[in-house]
């Protein structure tokens, strides 16, 4: 897509004060992690209570790892989510098409041998338009603080061109996000651990610094 100021998603929200602080810092979207294996897990009812108190125009994203499409549809309705982020390699085209209550963000965790044709095939078969690329680690589904190797990210994002909205995640912090944006030119950037005091507990100063760095890149 044509380069514009990148959209900013702050993920792993567990508290209302963090959600509001992220919003007022300038985040475009907030992520709520519904994976029971995550240190940033939030129960759907708690997420719904936070989302009800958000100001208008803030996008809300549910992160799903082990739920079925029917469970995702139900949680999305309970929480009034805008997007479902499918953060598990086991979610394929069939599962994406079965999520009918909201648009999907499909996550890929590329290793050095990653073939972008895998993404292009997914686009063609599912019509999903938004993809998030996170650092690969076989024992974890995101939130590790690890980065995608820069030349690998460049190769993927250049190859995708205008075919999708591509979001960069994985180890982004206030100190490195501007360089990553200038080099890779993603549609959006995503951070969780990079703006925290502890898993699920955000650092307001870091969130503000991250947003400022991303907007000024």
UniProtKB/Swiss-Prot annotation:
Pathway: Amino-acid biosynthesis; L-tryptophan biosynthesis; L-tryptophan from chorismate: step 3/5. Keywords: Amino-acid biosynthesis, Aromatic amino acid biosynthesis, Isomerase, Tryptophan biosynthesis. InterPro entries: Aldolase_TIM, PRAI_dom, RibuloseP-bd_barrel, TrpF_fam. It holds the Pfam family PRAI. Its EC number is 5.3.1.24. GO terms for molecular function: phosphoribosylanthranilate isomerase activity. GO terms for biological process: L-tryptophan biosynthetic process. It catalyses: N-(5-phospho-beta-D-ribosyl)anthranilate = 1-(2-carboxyphenylamino)-1-deoxy-D-ribulose 5-phosphate. This is N-(5'-phosphoribosyl)anthranilate isomerase. The gene is trpF. It comes from the Bacteria. Gene3D superfamilies: Aldolase class I. Belongs to the TrpF family.
């Amino acid at each position: 897509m044509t380069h514009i100021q990148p959209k900013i998603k702050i993920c792993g929200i567990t508290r209302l004060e963090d959600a509001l602080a992220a919003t007022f810092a300038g985040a475009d979207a907030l992520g709520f992690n519904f994976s029971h294996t995550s240190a940033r897990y939030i129960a759907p009812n708690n997420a719904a209570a936070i989302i009800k108190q958000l100001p208008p125009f803030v996008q809300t994203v549910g992160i799903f790892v082990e739920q079925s499409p029917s469970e995702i549809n139900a949680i999305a309705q309970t929480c009034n989510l805008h997007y479902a982020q499918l953060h598990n390699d086991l979610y394929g085209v069939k599962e994406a098409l079965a999520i009918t209550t909201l648009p999907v963000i499909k996550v890929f965790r590329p290793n050095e041998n990653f073939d972008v044709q895998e993404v292009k095939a997914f686009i063609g078969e599912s019509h999903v338009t938004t993809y998030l690329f996170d650092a690969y680690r076989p024992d974890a589904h995101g939130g590790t603080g690890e980065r995608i190797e820069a030349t690998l990210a460049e190769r993927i994002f250049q190859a995708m061109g205008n075919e999708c909205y591509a979001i960069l995640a994985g180890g982004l912090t206030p100190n490195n996000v501007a360089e990553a944006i200038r080099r890779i030119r993603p549609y959006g950037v995503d951070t969780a651990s990079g703006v925290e005091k502890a898993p699920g507990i955000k650092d307001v100063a870091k969130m503000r610094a991250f947003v400022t760095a991303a907007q000024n890149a």
